[in-house]
Design a protein with these regions (language model features):
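Core segments of cupin and vicinal oxygen chelate
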Residues: 1-39, 73, 83-89, 123-162, ...
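N-terminal beta-strand motif that seeds the catalytic metal site of vicinal oxygen chelate
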Residues: 1-3, 54-57, 105-133, 138-144, ...
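Surface-exposed beta-strand edges and flanking loops
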Residues: 16, 46, 167-169
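Active-site-adjacent scaffolding segments
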Residues: 19-112
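Vicinal oxygen chelate
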Residues: 31-34, 46-70, 72-127, 145-163, 168-172, 193-232, ...
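Short low-complexity stretches enriched in small and charged residues
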Residues: 50, 78, 137-140, 185
Length: 232
């Protein structure tokens, strides 16, 4: 259902790849790359039984194995040790001290960095905390000074001066565990949000902030997974 949902919502196209030793569970299995305008910023796989479903944000690193080892010294966890994905690269799955899942990758493909398919990642925290030291030491990220608006705090995250993500210490959703969410770019965010119920999803709410140029629109897709929209 997710493939049809995002094809209609965000004009994604798909390419199916075949693995003889599938990295997410072994054996022979197909996996899907999601493309838009030549960018392949997402993949769709069926996770093994011991893993939950949902979006996983990935950070590009020079050495996946070293990064995974470092995470464990910074109060993080390795959920899935480093593994190779044929035609894609080497990955690992980590959990930060707040419990949010984050992937690390060293890519070995020719697709360009996604700029039209996705916006900046967003970190949502239900308890108004963000493991800043963990991410600063793990990825050498830079953080802006907190931007406070109506008692809510935001931080921008940069790599070599380029904004790549943001933290929000509140959300329009109740009882939400800390997590990274992608922001999918669409031409008409409000129009796309109105179409969500017809596509089998659920509209949840939005966040506005004087420091953020566009609202973030939150929804559940046709499989019940959280995601947000922003303008292209």
């Amino acid at each position: 259902r997710a493939m049809s949902f995002y094809q209609s919502l965000a004009a994604w196209e798909y390419v199916t790849e075949h693995a003889t030793d599938f990295a997410w569970g072994g054996g022979t299995q197909d996996y899907v790359l999601a493309l838009k305008e030549g960018e392949a910023g997402a993949g769709i796989v069926t996770p093994p039984p011991d893993m939950s479903t949902g979006w996983v944000a990935y950070v590009e690193v020079d050495d996946v194995d070293a990064t995974a080892a470092l995470a464990e010294t910074l109060a993080g966890q390795v959920l899935r040790p480093p593994f190779d994905v044929p035609g894609v690269g080497r990955n690992a799955l980590l959990r930060d001290p707040n419990g949010a899942t984050i992937g690390v990758a060293m890519s070995r493909h020719n697709f360009p960095v996604t700029r039209r398919q996705f916006g900046n990642e967003v970190y949502l925290s239900a308890d108004r905390s963000f493991p800043r030291d963990f991410y600063a030491r793990l990825f050498d990220w830079e953080f802006s000074k907190p931007q406070v608006d109506e008692n809510h705090s935001r931080n921008k995250i940069a790599v070599q001066g380029q904004i790549v993500a943001a933290t929000w210490d509140d959300s329009p959703l109740d009882n939400l565990a800390s997590r990274w969410l992608p922001t999918i770019k669409v031409i008409d965010p409000l129009g796309s949000l109105r179409s969500v119920p017809d596509l089998g999803g659920v509209k949840l709410g939005q966040m506005s902030d004087a420091h953020v140029p566009q609202d973030l629109l939150f929804l559940e897709d046709a499989d019940g997974e959280l995601v947000c929209l922003t303008g292209a």
